[in-house]
Amino acid sequence: MSARGNLFIVSAPSGAGKSSLITALLKDKPQDMQVSVSHTTRAPRPGEVDGQHYHFVSVEQFKALIAENAFFESAEVFGNFYGTSRQVIENTLSLGIDVFLDIDWQGAQQVKKIMPEAIGVFILPPSKAELERRLTGRGQDSSDVIAARMAQAVSEMSHYNEYDFVIINDDFEQALADLKSIIFSQRLTCASQFHTHNDMLVDLLAD
């Protein structure tokens, strides 16, 4: 019997490397891990594909989904709306697949109220200077937008202590190894092992 999948909430200020870490984690398309594809009203960035990176919808469509109680969580960030499909998450977890939510602290608080057992991971940059360097290096945003993101980052990072784990993304490979360690450790909990190896445990303890 396979254990129910774990729900991982991964949050970070923009530029901390959250999306890159999740992409690296799933690059080999593991069958037991899946990132949740959120709905958003923001415009696609260069290279982003609808249905793969996000489900891009209009504000009217998004509000209709909220009215239908279709979202596990939703939040407004920088004037854009983001939401996670409730049914998709539940169905995926029931198959024993770990799901990763790439969401901010507001969304994390909503998820924790519904599913307290969700595991929170917060990614931090090694310094403000490095965070600004990464944002500038993207070449996607104006100086005004970067300044706004830096100001927002301080607010976001103040919520790090609401999470179960914290990773400092100074060295990318080490940060990725840390993330993998967190994931695999959750599969070795007593509850997970009981579900996965129930028959074996019953046999071992039989008279």
UniProtKB/Swiss-Prot annotation:
GO molecular function: ATP binding; guanylate kinase activity
Keywords, in A-Z order: ATP-binding, Cytoplasm, Kinase, Nucleotide-binding, Transferase
GO cellular component terms listed in the entry, alphabetical order: cytosol
Main location: cytoplasm
Enzyme class: transferase
Subcellular location: Cytoplasm
Residues holding ATP: A12, P13, S14, G15, A16, G17, K18, S19
E.C. designation(s): 2.7.4.8
UniProt similarity note: Belongs to the guanylate kinase family.
Protein name: Guanylate kinase
Organism: Shewanella denitrificans (strain OS217 / ATCC BAA-1090 / DSM 15013)
Record lineage: Bacteria, Pseudomonadati, Pseudomonadota, Gammaproteobacteria, Alteromonadales
